[in-house]
Amino acid sequence: MSQTRKKTSSEGETKPQTSTVNKFLRGSNAESRKEDNDLKTSDSQPSDWIQKTATSETAKPLSSEMEWRSSMEKNEHFLQKLGKKAVNKCLDLNNCGLTTADMKEMVALLPFLPDLEELDISWNGFVGGTLLSITQQMHLVSKLKILRLGSCRLTTDDVQALGEAFEMIPELEELNLSWNSKVGGNLPLILQKFQKGSKIQMIELVDCSLTSEDGTFLGQLLPMLQSLEVLDLSINRDIVGSLNSIAQGLKSTSNLKVLKLHSCGLSQKSVKILDAAFRYLGELRKLDLSCNKDLGGGFEDSPAQLVMLKHLQVLDLHQCSLTADDVMSLTQVIPLLSNLQELDLSANKKMGSSSENLLSRLRFLPALKSLVINNCALESETFTALAEASVHLSALEVFNLSWNKCVGGNLKLLLETLKLSMSLQVLRLSSCSLVTEDVALLASVIQTGHLAKLQKLDLSYNDSICDAGWTMFCQNVRFLKELIELDISLRPSNFRDCGQWFRHLLYAVTKLPQITEIGMKRWILPASQEEELECFDQDKKRSIHFDHGGFQ
């Protein structure tokens, strides 16, 4: 959210008071102000915040200069204690370990933030039971646009007070109440003030124990939320009972861009219900139906309207128990989603023998940046089809093939893809039964200057690679100048001595300026090599974590 500094016409009128406050700033806050001036993209300066507060009609006037200065000092101390700076539009106290006393101090701060647009106090358990004190001050922050209260242990009284306060913040655009179980069964109380013409653009209600009745209410409310762009109802399994109502409401949210129904207990019937709404969601960019294990078979007869989502960029169907008929049906639809950038079909075991045509047609998705098909039990034919199609995916940045055993011994099928992938940043080949020849091929590709953009490489759980293979790899990994994370851990049941390749790895690390994490779990280091690692840790100023889980 851009927060540019604005000069008000009343600056001249408030000069005496501003001058007094600036004296205070020159004392205890001079250093803080200097740091802010150095950051050209920073939020408003503390002096701006206090000056605007001084001229604001909404802030309660203080009876004397001494009281004003005392309040400023208390507020500054509170923010500094939490490692925060005074800003006039954004107050982010996410995961700050706020205590009950802190909450009281924060409430006292609100009158000095009349231009506040964003308030985030998520992941602070002590917020629960104290929200009334905040909502009673909502009229002082009537410009609020973003309110995040995720995982705050809100009580029934909290959510009721919140619902009554919404009419005092008519500019609200984003609301996050995720991971608050008391929201469930009380959604009408919370959203009762949302009326036609509401400016709300984002509603996130993840894991809120929503009931079927909540879903029915939401379905009736949706037609009033014409500005809604993001709706996340993930991990609320009971709303499946009111999916008809929700889908009916979705037909009136033509501006919706993100719909997340991850782990909502969706069934085969659910796909047909949602399919009827898709034709009205022409602006949808992201659709997440993942982790709905009873969804399998639902796409067999009802994927037709998916093709209407012309602007869809992200489709997540991982762990949906897709059947062979589902895959066949999706083969007719997914290749037509020409704007698709991210596709996740992982953990659908039936794809292994039925996805040859689908994977072959991925070549028609030139914008695809992320392809995740780990743990799909791919077979030789399907992997070959994927390898041939992947050559045409020049924009690919994330490629995850982990837990597909057929990759082992066949990495050569991806040789052209690896050579042509100028944008690839993440490559995951964990538990792919890779053999020495595979890792030697990978080393050769790296040595010749390919995969230059790679940032994360996962080769873990490939225990069949011999020491000679690891030596070739470690001798060449130094050419991956942008590498941040590398994982070569062994399986949990396997322990193995490190070979001489470990010295090559240590040398390579000195040539990798970005590396921060190296996974080496269950590799056994002899005493001499452990000493080398300790010396390396002491000599190098960079922070690199060797994750070994305790060398044996």
Curated annotation (Swiss-Prot):
Biased composition (Basic and acidic residues): 31-41
Region called Disordered, residue ranges: 1-65
Regions of compositional bias (Polar residues) in chain numbering: 42-58
LRR repeats: 227-246, 255-275, 283-293, 311-331, 339-360, 367-387, 395-415, 423-443, 453-475
Name of the protein in question: Leucine-rich repeat-containing protein 31
Gene assigned in the entry: LRRC31
UniProt keyword annotations, A-Z: Leucine-rich repeat, Repeat
A Pfam cross-reference name: LRR_6
